[in-house]
Amino acid sequence: LKCNKLVPLFYKTCPAGKNLCYKMYMVATPKVPVKRGCIDVCPKSSLVLKYVCCNTDRCN
């Protein structure tokens, strides 16, 4: 997950209200993202799922 301050055209900007980028993946397979996108609050990781969040509203 790249946290971007400057936005090239192909990076997406999160909508208002969901200004954190995040990536979710299984703890067993950290190289394979399950889901990525924008969220309002960074979820807590569990034993099965791990979340990585950016504090910027621009992500790839």
Curated annotation (Swiss-Prot):
Q: Identify one Gene Ontology CC term for this UniProt entry.
A: extracellular region
Please list the GO biological process terms of this entry: killing of cells of another organism
Q: Which cysteines are joined by disulfide bonds?
A: 3-21, 14-38, 42-53, 54-59
Keyword Disulfide bond assigned: yes
Described purpose of this protein according to its UniProt entry: Shows cytolytic activity on many different cells by forming pore in lipid membranes. In vivo, increases heart rate or kills the animal by cardiac arrest. In addition, it binds to heparin with high affinity, interacts with Kv channel-interacting protein 1 (KCNIP1) in a calcium-independent manner, and binds to integrin alpha-V/beta-3 (ITGAV/ITGB3) with moderate affinity.
Q: Which Pfam families match?
A: Toxin_cobra-type
Q: What is the recorded name of this protein?
A: Cytotoxin 2
Q: Organism, per UniProt?
A: Naja naja
Per its record, what are the GO molecular function terms? Answer: toxin activity
Q: In which tissues is it expressed?
A: Expressed by the venom gland.
